Regions:
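Periplasmic c-type cytochrome electron-transfer domains
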Residues: 1-355
């Protein structure tokens, strides 16, 4: 995982003049929107003193015993004016394996899950993304990114990021990703910007782009492991008992999928409802609503990425902390987890590691 940074107003909208995702690099002589992002970590102590009811501290036996921490961020040497109430939020990048299968989930099935949750008693009330007009003229439901701001992979986090993160141009993204205010500031600094205005030379051919998308959609999900072990089976029972499956919906059936027809009508188990949930004020970034992240493959993070940092801003250093950061709609599950025995907490985590 890496970070994306957002310079925004209190309501989550971008500060005027800044791109949706902050860019801190520029090819000389151009000057970036900011020289960098400063991240500071803060201690968090809950109302129980970071201890379970049995007296065991959170993260018992680890170097982080008894602690929970969360990050805040600010920009270093911003180029453009900032309002007094500006904020900087950081969000972790989202793994792109398995996203082709998620793309194949029907919009109507996600809406059906939303309606099911709204009809139920209890705190879990996920909300879907907005309907988005796609470049091909269709209207699709937003389901990708932490705030469901992208509807399809074709116009989604991986494909679009080639342009609005790295500024690689192609036929359907011919212009530099920048704001008029940034361009005007470059002129004020005496920098020749004539080469930036208007369509640019295509750096990525459409054939190369399509090849990339085949790879992107085809990234496989690692198989679940050890599901027949008694502790893992017991952990799965606890996962359901604690209500975790209320948001981390285990199973979907894909619909028709023209980009990769072989993905159609498959039963998949990503453990996400593809909806956004209120995770409490302590988890506020651009908002306090976050899409439920898929859990498949998370148990292999340490082997594949050499870390186990999770959550929208990577504040959770492992599965235990990820559960303990569940507030808002999910706080009742957090409380049930806290009241498990040491053995049961370990069994639940063993199940998560098996996915």
């Amino acid at each position: 995982n890496g970070y994306l940074a957002f310079v925004h107003n209190p309501d989550g909208t971008p500060v005027k003049g800044y791109t949706g995702m902050l860019q801190t690099k520029a090819v000389p002589p151009f000057v970036p929107y900011a020289k960098g992002v400063k991240i500071e970590w803060h201690d968090f102590v809950d109302q129980y003193g970071n201890k379970y009811p049995d007296g065991t501290p959170y993260n018992a036996g680890k170097p982080t015993e008894g602690t929970l921490t969360y990050p805040t961020a600010d920009v270093i040497e911003p180029l453009l004016p900032l309002p007094a109430d500006y904020r900087v939020s950081i969000e972790s990048t989202i793994g792109i394996y398995g996203t082709g299968l998620l793309d194949a989930i029907r919009d109507e099935d996600i809406i059906a899950e939303y309606r099911r949750q709204q009809s139920m008693t209890g705190p879990v009330k996920g909300i879907p993304g907005k309907w988005i007009d796609e470049p091909d003229g269709t209207r699709r439901l937003g389901k990708f990114t932490w705030d469901c701001s992208r509807a399809t992979l074709e116009n989604g986090p991986g494909a679009n990021a080639l342009w609005n993160v790295t500024n690689v141009t192609r036929k359907n993204r011919p212009n530099i990703y920048m704001t008029p205010e940034w361009l005007e500031k470059q002129k004020e600094l005496g920098i020749d910007v004539s080469g930036l205005e208007g369509p640019q030379e295509e750096e990525l051919s459409m054939q190369q782009y399509e090849d990339f998308m085949v790879w992107h959609r085809g990234l496989a999900v690692p198989a679940a492991r050890n599901l027949d072990k008694p502790d893992v089976r017991r952990g799965q029972e606890l996962f359901n008992k604690l209500g975790c499956a209320g948001c981390h919906k285990p199973e979907w059936t894909t619909g028709e999928y023209k980009p990769l027809p072989g993905y159609a009508n498959q039963t998949i188990r990503p453990y996400t409802d593809m909806l956004r949930h209120d995770m409490g004020e302590i988890n506020r970034g651009r908002s306090r609503f976050w899409r439920t992240p898929p859990l498949w493959g998370r148990g292999l993070m340490h082997k594949t990425a050499n870390h186990t940092d999770m959550f929208h801003d990577l504040r959770a250093r492992d599965f235990e902390e990820a559960i303990l950061w569940h507030f808002g709609e999910s706080e009742f599950s957090r409380e049930m987890f806290r009241h498990l025995s040491v053995e049961e907490r370990g069994q639940l985590i063993q199940f998560l590691k098996a996915l």
